[in-house]
Protein backbone atom coordinates (compact mmCIF):
# COMPACT_ATOMS: atom_id res chain seq x y z
CA UNK A 1 0.00 0.00 0.00
CA UNK A 2 1.22 3.49 -0.86
CA UNK A 3 2.09 5.85 1.99
CA UNK A 4 0.24 9.13 1.40
CA UNK A 5 1.75 12.55 2.02
CA UNK A 6 -0.41 14.78 4.27
CA UNK A 7 -0.69 17.51 1.63
CA UNK A 8 -1.81 15.19 -1.18
CA UNK A 9 -5.22 16.26 -2.47
CA UNK A 10 -5.57 12.92 -4.25
CA UNK A 11 -3.33 13.80 -7.20
CA UNK A 12 -0.50 11.47 -6.19
CA UNK A 13 -2.96 8.73 -5.28
CA UNK A 14 -4.50 9.00 -8.75
CA UNK A 15 -1.04 8.98 -10.35
CA UNK A 16 0.01 5.80 -8.59
CA UNK A 17 -3.36 4.13 -9.06
CA UNK A 18 -2.86 4.64 -12.80
CA UNK A 19 0.45 2.77 -12.35
CA UNK A 20 -1.35 -0.17 -10.74
CA UNK A 21 -1.36 0.27 -6.96
CA UNK A 22 -4.43 -1.19 -5.32
CA UNK A 23 -4.15 0.33 -1.87
CA UNK A 24 -2.98 3.23 0.24
CA UNK A 25 -2.00 3.59 3.89
CA UNK A 26 -3.77 6.23 5.97
CA UNK A 27 -4.07 6.56 9.71
CA UNK A 28 -7.66 5.92 10.74
CA UNK A 29 -7.87 9.57 11.83
CA UNK A 30 -6.04 10.95 8.79
CA UNK A 31 -7.10 14.26 7.30
CA UNK A 32 -5.53 15.87 4.24
CA UNK A 33 -3.92 19.27 4.60
CA UNK A 34 -6.28 20.52 1.92
CA UNK A 35 -9.58 22.35 1.55
CA UNK A 36 -11.24 18.91 1.51
CA UNK A 37 -9.86 17.13 4.58
CA UNK A 38 -11.32 13.84 3.34
CA UNK A 39 -9.76 14.18 -0.13
CA UNK A 40 -7.50 11.16 0.30
CA UNK A 41 -10.29 8.94 1.59
CA UNK A 42 -12.59 10.24 -1.15
CA UNK A 43 -10.01 9.49 -3.85
CA UNK A 44 -9.49 5.97 -2.51
CA UNK A 45 -13.25 5.38 -2.59
CA UNK A 46 -13.61 6.80 -6.11
CA UNK A 47 -10.77 4.59 -7.39
CA UNK A 48 -11.91 1.50 -5.46
CA UNK A 49 -8.61 1.28 -3.58
CA UNK A 50 -8.09 -0.53 -0.30
CA UNK A 51 -7.06 1.62 2.68
CA UNK A 52 -4.73 0.01 5.20
CA UNK A 53 -5.30 1.96 8.42
CA UNK A 54 -2.94 1.90 11.40
CA UNK A 55 -4.79 2.95 14.54
CA UNK A 56 -5.20 2.64 18.26
CA UNK A 57 -8.46 1.93 20.05
CA UNK A 58 -8.80 5.61 21.00
CA UNK A 59 -8.36 6.72 17.37
CA UNK A 60 -10.86 4.15 16.11
CA UNK A 61 -13.38 5.24 18.72
CA UNK A 62 -12.92 8.91 17.83
CA UNK A 63 -15.04 11.23 15.71
CA UNK A 64 -12.66 11.25 12.74
CA UNK A 65 -12.95 7.53 12.06
CA UNK A 66 -16.71 7.60 12.67
CA UNK A 67 -16.95 10.26 9.95
CA UNK A 68 -14.96 8.08 7.54
CA UNK A 69 -17.26 5.12 8.19
CA UNK A 70 -20.38 7.25 7.63
CA UNK A 71 -19.04 8.98 4.52
CA UNK A 72 -17.51 5.96 2.78
CA UNK A 73 -19.58 2.90 3.70
CA UNK A 74 -18.30 0.85 0.75
CA UNK A 75 -14.60 1.69 1.02
CA UNK A 76 -12.54 -1.39 1.88
CA UNK A 77 -10.56 -0.58 5.04
CA UNK A 78 -8.08 -2.90 6.73
CA UNK A 79 -7.60 -2.05 10.42
CA UNK A 80 -3.95 -2.79 11.11
CA UNK A 81 -2.33 -4.46 14.12
CA UNK A 82 -5.50 -5.72 15.85
CA UNK A 83 -6.62 -2.10 16.19
CA UNK A 84 -3.34 -1.14 17.84
CA UNK A 85 -3.93 -3.07 21.05
CA UNK A 86 -0.63 -3.81 22.78
CA UNK A 87 0.76 -5.65 25.79
CA UNK A 88 -0.47 -2.94 28.17
CA UNK A 89 -4.09 -4.02 27.59
CA UNK A 90 -5.69 -5.71 30.58
CA UNK A 91 -8.87 -7.75 30.99
CA UNK A 92 -11.68 -7.20 30.26
CA UNK A 93 -10.19 -5.25 27.30
CA UNK A 94 -13.13 -2.82 27.19
CA UNK A 95 -11.75 -0.31 24.65
CA UNK A 96 -10.51 -3.12 22.42
CA UNK A 97 -13.90 -4.85 22.62
CA UNK A 98 -15.57 -1.58 21.63
CA UNK A 99 -13.34 -1.36 18.53
CA UNK A 100 -14.34 -4.89 17.58
CA UNK A 101 -17.95 -3.70 17.36
CA UNK A 102 -16.87 -2.11 14.06
CA UNK A 103 -17.17 -5.62 12.64
CA UNK A 104 -20.79 -4.63 11.95
CA UNK A 105 -19.37 -2.70 8.96
CA UNK A 106 -18.93 -5.27 6.17
CA UNK A 107 -16.33 -3.10 4.42
CA UNK A 108 -13.87 -3.50 7.31
CA UNK A 109 -11.36 -6.26 7.91
CA UNK A 110 -8.66 -6.52 10.57
CA UNK A 111 -5.02 -7.54 10.46
CA UNK A 112 -3.62 -10.06 12.95
CA UNK A 113 0.06 -9.26 13.63
CA UNK A 114 2.79 -11.34 15.13
CA UNK A 115 1.83 -11.92 18.76
CA UNK A 116 4.90 -10.03 19.99
CA UNK A 117 2.86 -6.87 19.49
CA UNK A 118 0.52 -7.74 22.33
CA UNK A 119 2.31 -10.44 24.36
CA UNK A 120 5.08 -9.82 26.87
CA UNK A 121 8.46 -10.63 25.35
CA UNK A 122 10.55 -12.66 24.98
CA UNK A 123 9.25 -15.42 22.74
CA UNK A 124 8.05 -18.09 23.42
CA UNK A 125 5.13 -16.30 24.99
CA UNK A 126 3.96 -17.67 28.32
CA UNK A 127 0.76 -15.66 28.65
CA UNK A 128 -1.33 -15.01 25.55
CA UNK A 129 -4.35 -12.74 26.02
CA UNK A 130 -7.46 -13.72 24.00
CA UNK A 131 -7.18 -10.73 21.66
CA UNK A 132 -6.80 -12.75 18.45
CA UNK A 133 -9.74 -14.95 19.38
CA UNK A 134 -11.86 -11.89 20.16
CA UNK A 135 -11.12 -10.41 16.72
CA UNK A 136 -11.86 -13.69 14.96
CA UNK A 137 -15.14 -14.03 16.84
CA UNK A 138 -16.15 -10.46 15.97
CA UNK A 139 -15.06 -10.30 12.33
CA UNK A 140 -15.14 -13.96 11.34
CA UNK A 141 -12.11 -15.67 9.76
CA UNK A 142 -12.93 -14.36 6.29
CA UNK A 143 -12.30 -10.78 7.48
CA UNK A 144 -9.17 -11.41 9.56
CA UNK A 145 -5.77 -11.54 7.86
CA UNK A 146 -2.35 -12.32 9.25
CA UNK A 147 0.46 -9.85 8.63
CA UNK A 148 3.98 -10.12 9.98
CA UNK A 149 4.65 -6.43 10.78
CA UNK A 150 8.02 -6.73 9.08
CA UNK A 151 10.54 -5.16 9.64
CA UNK A 152 9.66 -4.23 13.30
CA UNK A 153 8.89 -7.89 14.04
CA UNK A 154 12.58 -8.66 13.52
CA UNK A 155 13.39 -6.99 16.84
CA UNK A 156 10.55 -8.75 18.68
CA UNK A 157 9.87 -12.44 18.10
CA UNK A 158 11.40 -12.65 14.61
CA UNK A 159 9.67 -13.16 11.29
CA UNK A 160 9.44 -16.98 11.50
CA UNK A 161 7.84 -16.89 14.94
CA UNK A 162 5.44 -14.12 13.87
CA UNK A 163 3.81 -16.72 11.63
CA UNK A 164 4.49 -20.03 13.36
CA UNK A 165 3.29 -18.94 16.80
CA UNK A 166 -0.15 -17.66 15.69
CA UNK A 167 -0.61 -20.72 13.47
CA UNK A 168 0.12 -23.00 16.41
CA UNK A 169 -1.89 -20.90 18.87
CA UNK A 170 -4.94 -20.98 16.58
CA UNK A 171 -4.60 -24.68 15.74
CA UNK A 172 -8.02 -25.43 17.25
CA UNK A 173 -9.67 -23.57 14.36
CA UNK A 174 -10.76 -25.56 11.34
CA UNK A 175 -8.45 -25.88 8.34
CA UNK A 176 -10.85 -23.65 6.40
CA UNK A 177 -10.83 -20.93 9.08
CA UNK A 178 -7.04 -21.00 9.26
CA UNK A 179 -6.80 -20.87 5.46
CA UNK A 180 -8.79 -17.65 5.50
CA UNK A 181 -6.76 -16.01 8.27
CA UNK A 182 -3.37 -17.05 6.92
CA UNK A 183 -3.96 -16.33 3.25
CA UNK A 184 -7.40 -16.26 1.69
CA UNK A 185 -8.60 -13.05 3.37
CA UNK A 186 -5.54 -11.12 2.19
CA UNK A 187 -5.88 -12.56 -1.31
CA UNK A 188 -9.52 -11.48 -1.44
CA UNK A 189 -9.13 -8.03 0.12
CA UNK A 190 -6.02 -7.15 -1.90
CA UNK A 191 -7.50 -8.76 -5.05
CA UNK A 192 -4.67 -11.12 -5.92
Question: Regions from the language model: what does each represent?
Answer:
Residues 1-6, 22-25:
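Short, well-structured secondary-structure segments
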Residues 1-4, 111-114, 145-147, 182:
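Short beta-strand segments
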Residues 4-8, 29-30, 150-153:
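Short glycine-enriched loops at secondary-structure junctions
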Residues 5-16, 36-37, 94-95:
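Short, acidic/polar
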Residues 16-31:
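Glycine-rich phosphate-binding "P-loop"
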Residues 24, 44, 81, 110, ...:
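Divalent metal-coordination and catalytic microenvironments
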Residues 31-145:
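Catalytic pocket-lining loop regions of alpha/beta-barrel enzymes
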Residues 134, 138-145, 154-192:
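Mid-to-C-terminal alpha-helical segments outside catalytic/metal-binding sites
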Amino acid sequence: AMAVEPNDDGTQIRHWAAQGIIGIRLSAASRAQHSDPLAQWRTAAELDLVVSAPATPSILLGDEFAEVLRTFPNLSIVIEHLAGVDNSAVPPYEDYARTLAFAEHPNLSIKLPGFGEFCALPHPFSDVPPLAEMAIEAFGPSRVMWGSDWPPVSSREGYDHSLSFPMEHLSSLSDDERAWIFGETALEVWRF
